[in-house]
């Protein structure tokens, strides 16, 4: 991968993840207790041998920038020409903010050119999966492709969420349609499925640059790889598909777009099963992150009716389950669940404090929230809608606004990420 430059797109507003993205960029949202969403893609880069990466940021990037600086910039060898660097919009070639995925790469065309890569690997910072990009690169080189895009098989009913790829049994891409309502296309590898783009592309640099320059001059373009770049390249360039190979090495392929609150909730709760498909404990494919120093988690009190327990849960360092019960949950660092409280099927971000005699289920609790004694969340949807954000499937999201108004003295709302 020494000839390859990674460009990781992390500038999306994450509107479908609101209110979790009200104060942070989507790739900076917590995942799996101790991680940020962007850690998954960055770990794939490092594990694949890709050690030159630009991260393109834009919206509410303070906590994301800090996380990258503190946790990732130091693990590559600068003296070897390796780097993981953040590139905010610099308006060097345009007066606009990033207007689309292709425009984001175009606006950093000078930074890309300065590294003189032979190949550019374009990635998204908000998906959950394990993938060895080097395998994709080998196919790209062996096939003599100008562009290779990673694909995964999906049900035809899901096409409105994906770029649909017309691919033959030799992996040639003969068509690309972004998020069609329906399609008659079927994958040659499984006639009941459709080949869909994963938003992962390898371009020869000498192909990418002129294509971006041409797109930038088109006033009718959305400046997006899926909507504009790839459909226009079909038939003119050699485009191949790479079938996703999951480094989890389980029977089912695991790739999740956590772009909605329900999808985000489900992906986190996947982790608490006995043998989750997405394996955080694989030493051969470690998931890295930046961790602050906390004491070990502990579970205290063993009295009748007051026993500190956590069952089928991910519990991070610094957590104290003090006479409460936690079931089927993901707890980020420094969470406290106090006596006689029950927390079920929920995600609690860092520094959440659950008071006594609380009952919480199917909820996402943002960081620094203090839940007052006796509070009930997740049991009455209509009541919850009056105070919190509730998804169509009934997941309740409690943000820091709740603590700001309910308990302004005990919570520092302005604590940094």
Swiss-Prot record:
Keywords attached to this entry: ATP-binding, Carbohydrate metabolism, Glycogen biosynthesis, Glycogen metabolism, Nucleotide-binding, Nucleotidyltransferase, Transferase
The UniProt record lists the keyword Nucleotide-binding = yes
Q: Which reactions are catalysed by this chain?
A: alpha-D-glucose 1-phosphate + ATP + H(+) = ADP-alpha-D-glucose + diphosphate
> Which residues make up the binding site for alpha-D-glucose 1-phosphate?
98, 163, 178-179, 197
Annotated disulfide bonds = none
Q: What class of enzyme is it?
A: transferase
What this chain does, per the entry, is described as: Involved in the biosynthesis of ADP-glucose, a building block required for the elongation reactions to produce glycogen. Catalyzes the reaction between ATP and alpha-D-glucose 1-phosphate (G1P) to produce pyrophosphate and ADP-Glc.
The chain's coiled-coil residues are none
In terms of Pfam families, this protein maps to: Hexapep_GlmU, NTP_transferase
Q: Does the keyword Ribonucleoprotein apply?
A: no
What is the protein's quaternary organization? Homotetramer.
Matching CDD domains: ADP_Glucose_PP (cd02508), LbH_G1P_AT_C (cd04651)
Its lineage reads: Bacteria, Pseudomonadati, Acidobacteriota, Terriglobia, Terriglobales
Organism, by scientific name, is Koribacter versatilis (strain Ellin345)
Gene (UniProt): glgC
Q: Which family does it belong to?
A: Belongs to the bacterial/plant glucose-1-phosphate adenylyltransferase family.
- Which processes are annotated in GO (biological process)? glycogen biosynthetic process
Q: What is its EC number?
A: 2.7.7.27
Q: Which InterPro entries match?
A: ADP-Glc_PPase, ADP_Glu_pyroP_CS, GlgC_bac, GlmU/GlgC-like_hexapep, NTP_transferase_dom, Nucleotide-diphossugar_trans, Trimer_LpxA-like_sf
Which molecular-function annotations from GO does this UniProt entry contain?
A: ATP binding; glucose-1-phosphate adenylyltransferase activity
- Pathway info: Glycan biosynthesis; glycogen biosynthesis
| Protein name listed in UniProt | Glucose-1-phosphate adenylyltransferase
């Amino acid at each position: 991968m020494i000839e390859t430059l990674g460009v990781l797109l992390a500038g999306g507003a994450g509107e479908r993840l609101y209110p979790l993205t009200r104060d942070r960029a989507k790739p900076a949202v917590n995942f799996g207790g101790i991680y940020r969403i962007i850690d998954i893609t960055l770990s794939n880069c490092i594990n694949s041998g890709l050690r030159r990466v630009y991260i393109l940021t834009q919206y509410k990037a303070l906590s994301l920038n800090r996380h990258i600086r503190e946790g990732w910039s130091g693990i590559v060898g600068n003296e070897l020409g390796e780097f993981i660097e953040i590139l905010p919009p610099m308006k060097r070639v345009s007066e606009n903010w990033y207007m689309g995925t292709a425009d984001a790469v175009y606006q950093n065309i000078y930074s890309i050119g300065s590294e003189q890569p032979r190949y550019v690997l374009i990635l998204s910072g908000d998906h959950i999966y394990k993938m060895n990009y080097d395998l994709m690169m080998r196919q790209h080189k062996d096939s003599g492709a100008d562009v290779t895009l990673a694909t995964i098989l999906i049900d035809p009913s899901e096409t409105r969420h994906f770029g649909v790829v017309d691919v033959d049994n030799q992996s040639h891409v003969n068509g690309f349609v972004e998020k069609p309502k329906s399609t008659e296309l079927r994958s040659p590898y499984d006639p009941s499925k459709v080949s869909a783009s994963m938003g992962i592309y390898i371009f020869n640099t000498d192909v990418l640059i002129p294509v971006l320059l041409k797109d930038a001059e088109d006033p009718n373009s959305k400046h997006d790889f899926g909507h504009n770049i790839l459909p226009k390249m079909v038939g003119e360039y050699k485009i191949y598909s790479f079938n996703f190979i999951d480094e989890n090495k389980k029977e089912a392929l695991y790739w999740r777009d956590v772009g909605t609150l329900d999808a985000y909730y489900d992906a986190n709760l996947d982790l608490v099963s006995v043998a989750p498909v997405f394996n955080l404990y694989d030493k051969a494919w470690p998931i890295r992150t930046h961790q602050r120093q906390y004491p070990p988690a502990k579970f205290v009190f063993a009295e009748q009716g007051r026993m500190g327990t956590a069952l089928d849960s991910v519990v991070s360092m610094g957590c104290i389950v003090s006479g409460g019960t936690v079931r089927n949950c993901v707890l980020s660092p420094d969470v406290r669940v106090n006596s006689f409280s029950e927390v079920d099927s929920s995600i609690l971000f860092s520094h959440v404090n659950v008071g006594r005699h609380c009952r919480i289920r199917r909820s996402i609790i943002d960081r620094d929230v203090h839940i007052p004694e006796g509070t009930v969340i997740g049991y009455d949807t209509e009541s919850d809608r009056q105070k919190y954000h509730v998804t169509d499937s009934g997941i309740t999201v409690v943000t820091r606004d709740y603590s700001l108004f309910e308990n302004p003295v005990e919570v520092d709302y302005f604590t940094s990420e």
